[in-house]
Amino acid sequence: MTTEVLSGKPLAAIIQQRAHEETALLDDEGVRPVLAVVVATDDESTHWYVRSIERAAGRAGIGCRIIDLGHDATEQVLASVLADLSAEPTVHGIILQTPLPAAVRADRLVGLIAPEKDIDGANPLSLGRLAVGQPAFAPATAQAVVELLDHFQIPVAGRNVAVVGRSAVVGKPLSLLLLERDATVTICHSKSGPLERYTQPADVVVVAAGRTGLLKGSHLSPETVVIDVGTNVLPDGSLVGDVDEASVTGVAAGLSPVPGGVGSVTTALLLLHTVEAARQQSRSGLLTASTSRI
């Protein structure tokens, strides 16, 4: 069996172009979308990712402010910066980039991001709104998965989808987005037992556990579609996902690569969310856009 490569790059280009076009429309109204990214780490891969966001924002005409507080930033300093950015009218979107210093509680900080500027769905209010079907920005990585499935015309309505991982960033919000599309969702985690019990009956498997080589070909039935959300840095600096690509290739009907799959779509969605946030804030101050399909 030939396994289709579900590259995210063409979809990311479409989303980035849409962000650019909508930014131009806002520019005609005298509004320039601005994204603020708060960083508190010396992790080089994180800084590389943040720089990639900055470059992509520049191409779309979106302002991008990188607030680098250093790896020893305190929770109090981070809280003050987030509160100031939430109150700053010229900033439309805010990202609190992880990882954070060991002594810092991210769960206490994300609640300080104004929901209308929470373009990566980090505030618990955003996740709560998502759960009950109210307008809110979905976490960009979770939304990137469903956008990628839509782009390749892979249906989920009435089908079994196994989500491996239950984080508040991907697993939980993704399950909500899939339920909105009438999928039958199973969430797998470290206490679920043998993985194949849940992944073999699945039509679609999404892996977001942060464990290199977790999903193998033996865990799948033929024709399963696999979306790899994992981002694991190997000792040589290369990036791999959670899927054992060698054993899955030839079994799965489709597989998203790492890098070049979900990640590129995630970055593009962060930009589009920023533009949507700027539009709503400039016109009404109310958040009305979030999980609309591309």
UniProtKB/Swiss-Prot annotation:
EC number: 1.5.1.5, 3.5.4.9
UniProt signal peptide: none
Highest taxon of the lineage: Bacteria
Binding site for NADP(+): 165-167, 190, 231
Gene Ontology terms for molecular function: methenyltetrahydrofolate cyclohydrolase activity; methylenetetrahydrofolate dehydrogenase (NADP+) activity
InterPro entries linked: Aminoacid_DH-like_N_sf, NAD(P)-bd_dom_sf, THF_DH/CycHdrlase, THF_DH/CycHdrlase_cat_dom, THF_DH/CycHdrlase_NAD-bd_dom
Biological or metabolic pathway of the protein: One-carbon metabolism; tetrahydrofolate interconversion
One Pfam family it belongs to: THF_DHG_CYH
SUPFAM superfamilies: Aminoacid dehydrogenase-like, N-terminal domain, NAD(P)-binding Rossmann-fold domains
Catalytic activity of the protein: (6R)-5,10-methylene-5,6,7,8-tetrahydrofolate + NADP(+) = (6R)-5,10-methenyltetrahydrofolate + NADPH; (6R)-5,10-methenyltetrahydrofolate + H2O = (6R)-10-formyltetrahydrofolate + H(+)
GO biological process: L-histidine biosynthetic process; methionine biosynthetic process; purine nucleotide biosynthetic process; tetrahydrofolate interconversion
Keyword entries, A-Z: Amino-acid biosynthesis, Histidine biosynthesis, Hydrolase, Methionine biosynthesis, Multifunctional enzyme, NADP, One-carbon metabolism, Oxidoreductase, Purine biosynthesis
CC terms in the record's Gene Ontology section: cytosol
Oligomeric form and interacting partners: Homodimer.
Functional summary from the UniProt entry: Catalyzes the oxidation of 5,10-methylenetetrahydrofolate to 5,10-methenyltetrahydrofolate and then the hydrolysis of 5,10-methenyltetrahydrofolate to 10-formyltetrahydrofolate.
Family to which this protein belongs: Belongs to the tetrahydrofolate dehydrogenase/cyclohydrolase family.
Protein name: Bifunctional protein FolD 1
